[in-house]
Amino acid sequence: MELMAITAKGIAIKIRNFEIPDIRRVMEIEEQSFLDGDAGLYLELYEEWPEGFMVAEKEDKVIGFVVMVLTPEGEGRVFALAVDSRYRGGGVGRTLLKAAFAVLRKMKIWYVLLEVRVSNVVAQRLYRCMGFVEIGFVPFYYKDGEGAIEMRKML
């Protein structure tokens, strides 16, 4: 899968499937965005479902990524979404999510779930703008003890 897109903020990007050489850049973005990253886990998720791992490129440099997983119950789940700090707020994350939703719809998956840190109000705002609604709370979800808000979007 590969598509050219202009984000809502006018950034020209290419959305494409993840490739193994992208892992170094993905981990750099991961380290900017999250407290704990695991390259081995990302590669394992890629091996399980390659179509669920997409990157956004600007001028041949990865500037963001989304990782989705399929649950045994047939649900879609956003495992990770991250954008290089220099491009946050530019619509890259929103564009990655739209591409991810298109993949899920093609597979006849009608809703997607995710968990987001209670403290990550910027991500919560993005997800709400994209149509996610809060459906629950999981205390002590993350390794550092922070809780997570569970959210769902009907596709």
Protein language model regions, located:
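Conserved catalytic-core motifs of GNAT/GCN5-like acyltransferases
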Residues: E115, R128, V133-I149
